[in-house]
Amino acid sequence: MKVRNSLKSLRTRHRDNRLVRRKGRVYIINKTQKRYKARQG
């Protein structure tokens, strides 16, 4: 999992990317392309 400052640019790179909030943190998850998994930090 990558830690990025801004997830908006990452989200637009693949159409299956989902933005989720868990425990006060923002995550990008992608079921089909696992390499797009990231957390905002």
UniProtKB/Swiss-Prot annotation:
The keyword Ribonucleoprotein applies. It holds the Pfam family Ribosomal_L36. This is Large ribosomal subunit protein bL36. Belongs to the bacterial ribosomal protein bL36 family. Keywords: Ribonucleoprotein, Ribosomal protein. One of its GO terms (molecular function) is structural constituent of ribosome. InterPro entries: Ribosomal_bL36, Ribosomal_bL36_sp, Ribosomal_L36_bact. GO terms for cellular component: ribonucleoprotein complex; ribosome. Transmembrane segments: none annotated. It comes from Beijerinckia indica subsp. indica (strain ATCC 9039 / DSM 1715 / NCIMB 8712). One of its GO terms (biological process) is translation. The keyword Ribosomal protein applies.
